[in-house]
């Protein structure tokens, strides 16, 4: 099996959703904890970015490989997905498991090179990825679970850097009798979760009939078309609110970018019946959302560090 087939198997283009938020998490943590560091710290801080990317690519590949393995029976029953690698036989289960092991290795090696906290918490995304394919068998909240999986992208990158300073307190919030609260990364991660949830609810419209026939609990299969549209718009407004509340570095760039992309996403959803290819348009606009927000973060003044709220 060649590189092209492997990239198709893991749908490499979907990495464009998570990658900008991985970078956003890294940039926020770097600006918060290391912007004023002396030059002796810069080399290993930049190496952190390399290992974060290795871990992120591994996590993304593992998530998709596990999804394909666990969902192969569902894929076989759906005309849209019946041509996928494991269903069609173009890839063996043995190869799929080997790829999963390689991606897991990338995740663990990247986390190991970062710090103890990153390595010890690597089980969390793995568990989330294993659970996700089963959620659609039992609840229409499966879309939210997928959103939470993607919400780990900025949170994981941020923790990987923050743990170099605060250790386990970057997660627990407890350090030396003080309670640490990091609102910016919390609301950005929550915003990502809601953004992906809104996208996935609309993405699932393609499989409504198949999902109903095969007992798959997607939101559009459970509820009406009108409710699906209304809910996805409400989720879009909620993710905009989360990004607005996060207010990284108190500048207008991020708020403006979030506002622009939320309007674009709502516009596409409302025009669904008038677009020649709603799914492709929604995919492009949703994918662009993360990159526009990343550009906004880059344009901000890095000296305006994100605040950490400390309570005794």
Locations of regions flagged by a protein language model:
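Multi-pass alpha-helical membrane architecture of UbiA-family
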Residues: 1-312
């Amino acid at each position: 099996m060649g590189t092209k087939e492997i990239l198709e198997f893991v749908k490499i283009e979907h990495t464009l959703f998570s990658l900008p938020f991985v970078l956003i998490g890294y940039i926020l943590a770097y600006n918060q904890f290391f912007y004023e560091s002396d030059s002796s710290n810069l080399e290993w801080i930049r190496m952190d970015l390399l290992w974060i990317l290795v871990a992120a690519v591994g996590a993304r590949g593992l998530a998709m490989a596990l999804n394909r393995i666990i969902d192969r029976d569902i894929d076989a029953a759906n005309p849209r997905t019946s041509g996928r690698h494991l269903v069609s036989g173009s890839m063996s289960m043995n190869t799929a498991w080997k790829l999963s092991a390689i991606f897991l290795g990338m995740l663990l090696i990247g986390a190991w090179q970062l710090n103890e906290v990153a390595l010890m918490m690597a089980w969390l995304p793995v568990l989330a990825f294993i659970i996700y394919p089963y959620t659609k068998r039992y609840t229409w909240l499966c879309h939210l679970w997928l959103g939470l999986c993607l919400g780990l992208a900025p949170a994981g990158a941020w923790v990987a850097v923050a743990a170099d300073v605060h250790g386990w307190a970057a997660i627990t919030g407890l350090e030396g009798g003080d309670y640490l609260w990091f609102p910016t990364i919390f609301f950005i991660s929550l915003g990502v979760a809601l953004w992906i949830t809104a996208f996935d609810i609309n993405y699932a419209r393609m499989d409504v009939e198949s999902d109903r026939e095969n007992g798959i609990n997607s939101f559009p299969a459970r509820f009406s078309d009108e409710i699906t549209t209304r809910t996805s718009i409400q989720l879009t407004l909620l993710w905009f609110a989360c990004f607005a509340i996060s207010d990284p570095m108190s500048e207008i760039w991020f708020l403006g970018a979030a506002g622009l992309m939320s309007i674009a996403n709502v516009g596409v959803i409302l025009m669904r019946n008038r677009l020649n290819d709603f799914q492709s348009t929604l995919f492009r606009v949703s994918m662009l959302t993360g990159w526009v927000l990343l550009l906004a973060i880059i344009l901000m003044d890095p000296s305006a560090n994100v605040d950490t709220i400390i309570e005794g």
